[in-house]
């Protein structure tokens, strides 16, 4: 170790390195080797929950545990400590006369943050706390940095997000939140697998951004000397698989959008997209409701979900309303009536709804009214369907009113949780929609996409009537963990 580096270390770090060297001198690897446990902390608590101090003493049972040393007290020949493993904490009771002088020194010199293995007798203290009375201590790994002060609840937000490992060590609530996230995703998989869906993987690098309205990240493939984009959706590749005959497919994966960051947006996030042949958007509404209710029940049990003090009736049938009806109910404006673009713009001006340069159809105005007046009112789970064709380039037109599509979005607590539709499988109509998107892009719409001719070719081979769905996994995890910022459900959120 260089002198320069030593000078950068604080006193505690220097002492810990000295202890590391001392372990080596004793023939002990400071960073340990394989260690076999017989139980974790929770398994022991569950197994012996109904046994008191005397009953445990009479059973004379032993266990071998391992974990991070997070508390330590005592002096002389007796010490108490807590080890933390994935499931929680358990106390250890160490006596010099039980483990021997040399072994006791390992415990005595261990620092908070070190990993220890402990063999011993399962017991209860006079206070009733389940503990392991050590018969042997094994040093497993040396922590060369001390845990943060007040590590029982790390509170510095920057540290929490930049050094998630410290947050996981320090905040059990945070640790459990990410365990819950994992369970939510596992249960969604289980639900779809049981319904005959195949989980598939599609490319992250695309030649052309598509499947959503979003600005992509652009990268360059050196070997082929071509620009590529990180995917903004998995949609178009998954629908190619429907063309190929897979019939029921889904993908859970990372999506990348080169856009702003706020409480519900991160440049990379996790979504699930699901496609089902021979289905329409009504079938997908039922599927969406089932997915979300199953996920909620798996982590919250039966009944409603409490989110930031509001009771969300996620266990009841979700409300369903047409976008035009929702706008009319709140504003009195009736977009069922036929009108020109100029008439729609005049109504927008009267209601002080901003009109962007790329609003070239009445449908753009309708969507702007919805975003301005309706979204903020949608607290309970609500399917809003019937989006205008102008803002739904991949959705099938409604056969009864071709200004609108067989599309829906799911809203909960004013936020969009899912987007779905009866998929457009007419390649000629799809090409004209792509061309309209390309024109909007030229007019300054950063979220409009170009034309994916390969996808058009795939459709020309024939795609069966299909329903498709996308759900933002992170927002769903926020809802089911009562979290207000997406950074609290992403292990490693994007930071400046």
UniProtKB/Swiss-Prot annotation:
What Pfam families does the annotation carry? tRNA-synt_2, tRNA_anti-codon
Q: Where does Mg(2+) 1 bind?
A: 409, 416
**Presence of keyword Magnesium:** yes
Sites binding Mg(2+) 2 sit at 416
**Co-factor(s):** Mg(2+)
Q: Which UniProt keywords apply?
A: Aminoacyl-tRNA synthetase, ATP-binding, Cytoplasm, Ligase, Magnesium, Metal-binding, Nucleotide-binding, Protein biosynthesis
Q: Which reaction is this enzyme known to catalyze? A: tRNA(Lys) + L-lysine + ATP = L-lysyl-tRNA(Lys) + AMP + diphosphate
Location(s), subcellular: Cytoplasm
* Gene Ontology BP term (one): lysyl-tRNA aminoacylation
GO MF annotations in UniProt: ATP binding; catalytic activity, acting on a protein; lysine-tRNA ligase activity; magnesium ion binding; transferase activity; tRNA binding
EC numbers listed for it are 6.1.1.6
Q: How and how many cofactors are bound, per the record note?
A: Binds 3 Mg(2+) ions per subunit.
What GO cellular-component annotations does this UniProt entry give? cytosol
Q: Which SUPFAM superfamilies match?
A: Class II aaRS and biotin synthetases, Nucleic acid-binding proteins
**Which domain of life does the UniProt lineage start with?**
Bacteria
Q: What is the first-listed, main subcellular location in coarse terms? A: cytoplasm
Please give the NCBIfam families that the UniProt record associates with this protein: lysS_bact, PRK00484.1
Under the subunit heading, UniProt states:
Homodimer.
The entry's family comment says: Belongs to the class-II aminoacyl-tRNA synthetase family.
Q: What is this protein called?
A: Lysine--tRNA ligase
Tell me what organism the protein belongs to: Streptococcus pneumoniae serotype 4 (strain ATCC BAA-334 / TIGR4)
Lineage, highest ranks first: Bacteria, Bacillati, Bacillota, Bacilli, Lactobacillales
Q: What's the name of its gene?
A: lysS
